[in-house]
Amino acid sequence: MNKKSTAIFLMGPTASGKTDLAIQLHQELPVEVISVDSALIYKGMDIGTAKPNAQELALTPHRLIDIKDPSENYSAAEFRHDALQEMQKITQQGKIPLLVGGTMLYYKALLEGLSPLPSADEKVRLEIEQKAEKFGWATLHNELAKIDPISAQRINPNDSQRINRALEVFYLTGQSLTELTAQKGKEIPYHIIQFAIAPDRAVLHQRIEQRFHKMIEQGFQQEVEKLYQRSDLHPNLPSIRCVGYRQMWEYLQGNYDKDEMIFRGICATRQLAKRQLTWLRGWKSPIEWLDSLNPKSTKEKIIKTIKHNCK
């Protein structure tokens, strides 16, 4: 049996210092960086996403950054496909893939594979919507309860979008959403070493606030104004729903003043960090936690672990 190639996950909440650490590791280890961030994929969204700057990217190139226009969607399945391709290219060069970011759903998809859910079918969705107009979503929720009682219990009777998707999956496959999501895709064909970096809550909150104010100083408002002027962008797109961007967009719409926008942006970023930490604390695979307040010992710990595992 061939020995699996090694890959490294460097996970953590927003503003935890992942990018700086990745750049240091790139200077001392034979690693190439792959971004695992659902916001960094977008072109023209640099300041509000805390994207590495041109100098940092010249020093340490990041793959899967700036690969989509803000008008486009990008799924966890697409990420898995693209990341595995990049990982293969890196290992073929005799180097180690270093996956850095905080989009935990992407890590999960990469690690465990994805359930074999069908793609959306506009014709089927339209038929379900027409049925709902005639009989009401409560009736369709009752139908779902007969087909898939577990999903029906989870989904609010007023949540038309999720009822539609659950019924659509059944109509297309003959299997319930619960049955299909229980099926795992292919696991990642690599030996994964996983690290997580997370400062103390008070430190993280302070960093998030400082970083948001710094983004404002760097021209975050002007960045979002350019997006706001585009006729093809709107608040329901994943790009505009990114933390900070949504609040700035609503400020530009006149929904609240600048101080309120800053307050909401900081709060939303802190909530994102909390969700990311919740994911990490419930992570099934073994994680080595790093001391974010001692960068030197953190870097040395990673280097020692990698060298030991790559003998």
Swiss-Prot record:
Give the binding site residues for ATP: G12, P13, T14, A15, S16, G17, K18, T19
**Marked site (Interaction with substrate tRNA) residue numbers:** T103, R125
Question: Does the record carry Repeat as a key word?
Answer: no
> Which UniProt keyword terms apply here?
ATP-binding, Magnesium, Nucleotide-binding, Transferase, tRNA processing
Name this protein carries in UniProt: tRNA dimethylallyltransferase
Q: Which domain of life is it from?
A: Bacteria
Outline what the protein does: Catalyzes the transfer of a dimethylallyl group onto the adenine at position 37 in tRNAs that read codons beginning with uridine, leading to the formation of N6-(dimethylallyl)adenosine (i(6)A).
Interaction with substrate tRNA: annotated segments = 37-40, 161-165, 241-246
* Species annotation: Histophilus somni (strain 129Pt) (Haemophilus somnus)
**What family is it from?**
Belongs to the IPP transferase family.
Query: What sections of the protein cross the membrane?
Result: none
